[in-house]
Amino acid sequence: MSWSLFKTKCNVLTGPQHISTELFAQTITSGYHQAVSLHFDSMSAGGKIVNNAPKLPILYNQFLAQCKANLAQHNEIHILNQMGPMILNYWAGIIIQGPTGTSSVLNPGTWTGIPVVQNFDFQIILNAMITCFRTHIMTLQGQYVSSVLPGVTSSWAGPMLQSLP
């Protein structure tokens, strides 16, 4: 799934005026999970993430709790900054396995949230969210272990993890 398909999936949130908090959290987190699940690692010859399935319910519950807490706020909310620790937690310990080896995420990277001015255009928020997601993936760091040449290891970084446009 590309980030444009993530955006298409999330456009369901632009329909009815009163989307439930649960549907909002479920749509964003499952869309993110699907988007990163379909990334492939160029260093391991097309490796896929193999251990992120248990991370989706955790991500959903964290995001849902934050959204519910935000409903009680009367101050300005920066949801993209609030997502940072959740996304970093999602990436901690991720393993990517491919035909030529395994890449392990040892450093879940850094998160940079973009402040979005309050508006009524969900596309602005979605575009900012995708920018944060894509920028974060570039900061991932880890180690690659070759299965073709035993004992060969190399440092690994997020730019090796690629997606469709």
Locate the predicted segments by residue:
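Amphipathic alpha-helical hairpins/coiled-coils and adjacent low-complexity
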Residues: M1-P165
